[in-house]
Structures are given as structure tokens and as C-alpha cells.
């Protein structure tokens, strides 16, 4: 859970971009994630509803995982007032761990400013230009989320824009983090981390790739084969064999005891049936 006494700035921070319970169960215990990010598109993809009650329950589900220090959820509305009201309602469950995402439009920035004023933690999302980091910092946002893959799809320099955003935050001496989103491959994470970026949200597919280098997997298999040949599992196998033999012996002893008990019962019945009655004895 989020600890207000801990300074999370300056530390690498990874989020899982998913609203899927199945994906949460697989990836959140891995140890690399500090929280979960969502948006209406992700909610729809993962079969979730987008309303205050449903998202409050979703937050409860996510925060049940020990790894989750933050849960990011997006507000909605056509006006800044609507976005502000929905943001307040979304954060109400636990303002210390819920971060409200707000699009970086004019109405969104106004809503973000109002939320920050009310003590709500905020992410300015759907950022496509470096100047949007300035806007986010100006209203006191905790995060600004540039969309790397979508910038590249639109013919923009996603990498260069995000690096410039990071430099802007550093120069402003701002605590705001550049939350890199729309990440398509693990190579981009490594390059951006080398350039100073320290906060990412990734899909389950990219998480799979983070742990899935084929050479690492093959080396691990080679290690296991050697370890097996030179006795790494011998003690465990011997213990299992002893347990098997002990269980078999106990089963045999129980069967023998049951047989002896049955034989004794049969003998007693036979003895009782052959004893003469009193009338026969007087003849």
C-alpha cells in the first residue's frame, strides 16, 4: 500500500496497464509493479463497467494485492466540472492510493487544477507533445502520461518527445513523474530508462516479454539440467521415496491389523455358535 512517509521519487516505478483480474493475479506478485493503471478503453477491453460504483469495487480488488501502492483510474465528462465531480467520487474510496487520470485538454487541465486543490492526486493523460509536461507541472499534477507508441504511429518522434519531457521535469525541479504509456516493446523501456525515464506502465504482453528472453530461458534450462545431474534434487527425491515407503508400510500394517481383527471376530463368532445350550446339557 502507499505510504505517505516514503519518498517514491527517484526510484524506478512500473505499473501494470490492465483491468483484468487474471492478468493481475499473474503479474502483480512478480515484484516489479507498484500499481495498476486503467482507462475507459482498457475497462471496455477487459469487460469492466465505467461508473463510480463499479470502479470503486475495481479499486478494492486491485488494492487487495500487497504490491499495489497506487491505483490509477480515469475520470470522464464533457466539462471540467463534470470531470472534477467524477474525479472526487473516484478518489473518495482512498485518496492516498487512488490517482485520478485527466486528459490534457483545456477542460481537463481546469479539472485537474481543481482536483489538486482538493488534495486529489492527478495524472495528466493522453499527452502527445513536450509542452504538455509544462502544463501538467503548472497545475501540480503527480504524473503526465505520454503515449509513446501512438506518437510514433502518428509520425511523431515519440522517444525524443518523452526524453524532452523528462528533461523539462528535471529542470523544473518538479516531483512530477513522466509516466510513459503505450509502450509496445521492451527495447523502448531500456532506451528510455537509459535516457533518464523512471516510470512506465506496460501491458501484460510487454510484461511477458520482460521476462521472456529466449537465451535467458535456455541458460536456465541448462543450469537445471546440470544441477539435476550432480544431485541438486537427490535429497528431495530420497525424502519422497522414504515417505512413499513409510506410507506403504503403514498401509500394509493397517491392512494386517484389520485382517487380524476380522479373524478374531470370526473366531469369537464360531466359538459362540458351537457352545451347547442349557437344555442340551440336562439330557
Regions found by a protein language model. Give the residues of each.
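Catalytic beta/alpha-barrel core
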Residues: 15-17, 72-78, 96-105, 121-134, ...
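Active-site beta->alpha loop and helix N-cap motifs at the rims of alpha/beta catalytic domains
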Residues: 10-24, 29-32, 38-114
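Glycine-enriched alpha-helix->loop->beta-strand junction motifs that scaffold or abut catalytic
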Residues: 31-35, 94-97, 114-123, 138-145, ...
